[in-house]
């Protein structure tokens, strides 16, 4: 009798899923990492929690701060843990919108780009693109000198900070202000921005957490 009831329940479940795939899905609330305030980022549907793991969520910094000046800053987070209907994330990257970057470079100025790989004191390895815009046109030698100064200041800041402190300074603009001070010693600057961040490698304990969660969900689903 019990076997018959199970078979009937299974048939009903299959019938529902054929009629409406959304019927079996649940809504999960995705949260920012604690070092970025732990605020709710989005609501996402999934039939199984396993299908959420390692999914990337992209939002504007404006969605977190409600500050209109933060609209051009895109943030990427990766889901690495699910607890009930709550999905926790880790930072994956940042990028300024193309329109905003284009608006920074004006006639009669020079653009100086620097790409630097840094490591925080808690083991996060990130590739960071810095954009500096000068007040007037400058030559190749000055561009190289600004690039070197900015790269050195950026590497020092990262190595002295954990990822939470570092990202907080990026998002608040204080890191860009420090890099501005470093670069203007070579030539007058109009603007310095952290244009892009990509996480190249997470600390071992961060990776192990994600691997354990994926493995646990695979076992639960089998």
Swiss-Prot record:
InterPro entries: Ribosomal_eS1, Ribosomal_eS1_arc. It comes from the Archaea. GO terms for biological process: translation. Pfam families: Ribosomal_S3Ae. Keywords: Ribonucleoprotein, Ribosomal protein. GO terms for cellular component: ribonucleoprotein complex; ribosome. This is Small ribosomal subunit protein eS1. The lineage of its organism: Archaea, Thermoproteota, Thermoprotei, Thermoproteales, Thermoproteaceae. The gene is rps3ae.
């Amino acid at each position: 009798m019990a076997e018959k009831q199970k078979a009937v329940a299974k048939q009903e479940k299959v019938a529902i899923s054929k009629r409406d795939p959304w019927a079996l899905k649940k809504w999960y609330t995705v949260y920012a990492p604690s070092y970025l305030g732990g605020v709710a980022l989005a609501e996402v549907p999934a039939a199984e929690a396993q299908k959420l793991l390692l999914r990337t969520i992209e939002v504007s910094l404006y969605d977190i701060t409600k500050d209109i000046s933060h609209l051009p800053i895109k943030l990427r987070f990766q889901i690495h843990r699910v607890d009930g209907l709550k999905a926790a994330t880790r930072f994956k990257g940042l990028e300024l919108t193309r329109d905003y970057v284009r608006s920074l470079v004006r006639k009669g100025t020079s653009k100086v780009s620097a790409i630097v790989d840094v490591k925080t004191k808690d083991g996060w390895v990130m590739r960071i693109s810095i954009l500096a815009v000068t007040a007037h046109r400058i030559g190749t030698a000055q561009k190289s000198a600004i690039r070197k100064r900015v790269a050195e200041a950026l590497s020092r800041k990262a190595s002295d900070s954990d990822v939470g402190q570092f990202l907080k300074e990026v998002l608040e603009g204080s890191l860009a202000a420090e890099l501005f001070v470093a670069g203007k010693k070579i030539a007058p600057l109009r603007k310095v921005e952290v244009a892009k961040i990509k996480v190249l490698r997470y600390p071992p304990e961060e990776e192990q957490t994600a691997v354990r969660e994926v493995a646990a969900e695979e076992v639960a689903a089998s």
